[in-house]
Structure formats: C-alpha cells, structure tokens
C-alpha cells in the first residue's frame, strides 16, 4: 500500500436502528473532528429549553467513543433521562489511487466494516424490555436486566489452524 494514497472515504447508506423516533428528535451526527463543547451546547440548549424531548447521538469508527462521551455528559447534566443504545457495523468504502501514474497500478476500492453507535436520550419513558435500555439514574454499564434476546451471541468454536 506504500504506492497508493487514499483518495476518499464514503460511508455507505444504512437504515437507522431506531426508525420509530418522534419527528421533533434532535439527531446529533458526531464526527471525528466534532468539538464536544459545540455538540453539548446544542443538545443541552434544546433539552433544557424544552424545545425537544429526545436527542440521538450517533457516531461511527473513531467517533463512536466521542458520541458515547457526549451522551454520558448530557445524562450527568440533565437528570431523569432514559437511555437506549444500539450498536451495529456500517460499511465504508475507501478509494485508493496510485501515488505515481507511471507505475501501471490500478485504482483500488476497499470495503470495511466499522463499528457504529446510536444513543437515544429521552425525557419520556422508553420500553424497558428493549435491548440496550438503561433507566434514569442507573450507573453507566448497569442497565435493566437483559432479556434472553439481548445477551451476547454464542461464541463460535475456534478453527484448528494447525497443519
């Protein structure tokens, strides 16, 4: 890959894991270069001002951690918020072009699967049986009792790679 440079990266469209959101929901798309203070200023202003009752922080790749951080800060500053978290992988398509045109190399397109997170914070009660629900006042990481469909998937057996 030393003879290639990245020409661009495109996140392929995917459906939201939370399609049933009310129309007044504030959707905060967190990017790698987003400033946390700007994101928090808008989200806290709308929540505390009463113009919205729901905020969704979403981020993929390196921005996933920043989206979770924003949600945790908002939960700490606005008491009584219900939380619903969804995780999934998104496809990203990277384009690579040769660094010098006379090498005879073709342009490349690479598809990657990157982790993504959506965190819904709501003043209104949410369905506690939903996978990823966390009630107000619960310490981070300690949500409701998971239903059997929410637990981790069974691990696959490791393949024997010895020859």
UniProtKB/Swiss-Prot annotation:
Residues 153-163 have a biased composition (Basic residues). InterPro entries: Alba-like_dom_sf, Alba-like_NAB, DNA/RNA-bd_Alba-like. Residues 1-24, 126-163 are annotated as: Disordered. It is found in: Nucleus. Its main location: nucleus. Keywords: Nucleus. GO terms for cellular component: nucleus. One of its GO terms (molecular function) is nucleic acid binding. It holds the Pfam family Alba. It comes from the Eukaryota. Belongs to the histone-like Alba family. May be a component of ribonuclease P or MRP. This is Ribonuclease P protein subunit p25-like protein. The gene is Rpp25l.
């Amino acid at each position: 890959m030393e003879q290639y440079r990245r020409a661009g990266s495109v996140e392929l469209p995917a459906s939201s894991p939370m399609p049933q959101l009310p129309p007044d929901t504030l959707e905060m798309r967190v990017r790698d270069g987003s400033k946390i203070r700007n994101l928090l200023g808008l989200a806290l202003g709308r929540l505390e001002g009463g113009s919205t009752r729901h905020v969704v922080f979403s981020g993929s790749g390196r921005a996933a951690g920043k989206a979770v951080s924003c949600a945790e800060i908002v939960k700490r500053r606005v008491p009584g918020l219900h939380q619903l978290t969804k995780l999934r992988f998104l496809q990203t398509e990277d384009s690579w072009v040769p660094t010098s045109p006379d090498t005879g190399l073709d342009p490349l397109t690479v598809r990657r699967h990157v982790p993504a997170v959506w965190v819904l914070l709501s003043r209104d009660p949410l369905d506690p049986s939903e996978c990823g629900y966390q009630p107000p006042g619960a310490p981070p990481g300690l949500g409701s009792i998971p239903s059997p469909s929410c637990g981790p998937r069974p691990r696959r057996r490791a393949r024997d790679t010895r020859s």
